[in-house]
């Protein structure tokens, strides 16, 4: 069951939000430099406090989504509005970030628990990204 796999692995991710989220953002910025344009004053070095702080925000939002798997849109509506209407983030960036979150979690959890949950985690991140991009229509 997708839900049980997400609920099993996500608390381990959430408890390291700044580290894992920061690592995912660092990988995103390194691999996709065009995404840096939304953060003009950031220090983009690996252990930057700014990257870790924003990474924690990302993981915290995903933690909230994991608690509301039946209503991700409702749970994160204000955040989605912010990204779509105020920040005007290119919706093509969300799948890129989801990929780097997946890679980071795979690196941090090289055991079987993640192997089983990888597909479900990918679907979860795609659902969150899909909900985010729905605001752009």
From Swiss-Prot:
PTM info: The N-terminus of the mature protein is acetylated.
PROSITE patterns: GLOBIN
Keyword Iron among record annotations: yes
Gene3D superfamilies cross-referenced by the UniProt entry: Globins
Domain Globin: 1-137
UniProt-listed GO biological process terms: hydrogen peroxide catabolic process
Molecular-function GO term, any one: peroxidase activity
Positions bound to heme b: 83
GO cellular component: blood microparticle; haptoglobin-hemoglobin complex; hemoglobin complex
Keywords for this protein: Acetylation, Heme, Iron, Metal-binding, Oxygen transport, Transport
Keyword Heme carried by entry: yes
Tissue distribution of the protein: Red blood cells.
Chain positions recorded as O2 binding sites: 54
Family statement drawn from the similarity comment of this UniProt entry: Belongs to the globin family.
Record-given protein name: Hemoglobin subunit alpha-2
Originating species: Telmatobius peruvianus
